[in-house]
Amino acid sequence: MASGSVAECLQQETTCPVCLQYFVEPMMLDCGHNICCACLARCWGAAETNVSCPQCRETFPQRHMRPNRHLANVTQLVKQLRTERPSGPGGEMGVCEKHREPLKLYCEQDQMPICVVCDRSREHRGHSVLPLEEAVEGFKEQIQNRLDHLRRVKDLKKRRRAQGEQARAELLSLTQMEREKIVWEFEQLYHSLKEHEYRLLARLEELDLAIYNSINGAITQFSCNISHLSGLIAQLEEKQQQPTRELLQDIGDTLSRAERIRIPEPWITPPDLQEKIHIFAQKCLFLTESLKQFTEKMQSDMEKIQELREAQLYSVDVTLDPDTAYPSLILSDNLRQVRYSYLQQDLPDNPERFNLFPCVLGSPCFIAGRHYWEVEVGDKAKWTIGVCEDSVCRKGGVTSAPQNGFWAVSLWYGKEYWALTSPMTALPLRTPLQRVGIFLDYDAGEVSFYNVTERCHTFTFSHATFCGPVRPYFSLSYSGGKSAAPLIICPMSGIDGFSGHVGNHGHSMETSP
């Protein structure tokens, strides 16, 4: 490449597209372009959101930029090379202003071209000096290295941006699918309710017709009777006002006709109509209660799913610590299952091991933050799970209660669920626990338990005071039958459509060997 072309390329790479001058404090944007800090300040003003790149016009939701120190260094080198560029015919450098000798050398300490007299002077004595051409080639190589680095970073940024755009498109596609599902489900629900509405309204129309047909004849008869009575009353009123001779004429017949009129029986609504209306009212009441229960259950289920999902965001990988296991507890090779055996293993009685009760602790330890894991208890008749402080007594008997550093729930005799508070709290569960979720919020002092199968909350220990690291806690004993099955720590990846934990905002200490 000709030197002029190289110079032009260097000039373009180190020039701000806004002020068209050498970069001063270049700042890299998310789109990969570089702009002077002052130029960005003029372009963006006081705006903090929805700012755009002055070069490509890509819009960013928030104001975000990073100093590009590599480009700043390259710019300084290019500016320095321009000031040191050979001048005059033949491409020779100028002369030293002090000694009037050609500038053929370069002092690395002072970063300036010097002449041979300067090289021998006291000012540059002991300095590292290179031929000017060699120094220029070195600088060009440095510039090229930095340009290569910047181009690699730019390409990487472009790939990251493409990955972000792809992720955004995929996530938006998922939300669109969920949106379509919601619209479809509610349309089906709407059509179903509309059909029930039409049926009920049609039944009301039938009732209206039955009422009209049943009562209309009686009403017509009453109307005729009323008309007849009106005529008779008019005759009697007229007779009452007649002179004596006329009044006495046909008086017997007139009074006889009046006496034959009987008082009507009390009105009685046809019983079959009353029964039909009562049945319909019961249907409407059932409809009202059903819709109310449906709405409440839907809201409750949505809240349950949300609460459990929020806990599952903090899922951690829990394993069993064999150094803590009671000798009758058999651990699986992957340290995720534990079962009880009547035959005790010959294990060292190290300080960490429980020696009286069939207990084992999990790893890791937790010293802050939020953490969630799940345990498959199956049909076991007796078990205890939860958390405990790492400092709990391992030797001899100890009551599993908060004052002793334990926060756990337990099943006794296959039917009695208890929260091991002090005193204990009975848990009247509607369905047996098969899979239990444990959520530890260390900083808030809370330990919560969930029925994962039913997606509902079971119990929460509040206002707990943790004195040091906290660990998962497991205890079980043998009762025969199905209860001989192991407790299983469930792998969290992919459970119920959940893929791994999004983020564990806390701290833990690994304790497994």
Curated annotation (Swiss-Prot):
What reaction does this catalyse? S-ubiquitinyl-[E2 ubiquitin-conjugating enzyme]-L-cysteine + [acceptor protein]-L-lysine = [E2 ubiquitin-conjugating enzyme]-L-cysteine + N(6)-ubiquitinyl-[acceptor protein]-L-lysine
Mind listing the UniProt keywords for this protein, alphabetically? Coiled coil, Cytoplasm, DNA-binding, Endosome, Metal-binding, Mitochondrion, Nucleus, Repressor, Transcription, Transcription regulation, Transferase, Transport, Ubl conjugation pathway, Zinc, Zinc-finger
Tell me where in or outside the cell this protein is found. Answer: Nucleus; Cytoplasm; Nucleus, PML body; Early endosome
Recorded GO cellular component terms are: cytoplasm; cytosol; early endosome; endosome; fibrillar center; mitochondrion; nuclear membrane; nucleoplasm
Name where it mostly resides. Answer: nucleus
For whether the record's keyword set contains Metal-binding, the answer is yes
| Designated name of the protein | Zinc finger protein RFP
Provide the taxonomic classification. Eukaryota, Metazoa, Chordata, Craniata, Vertebrata
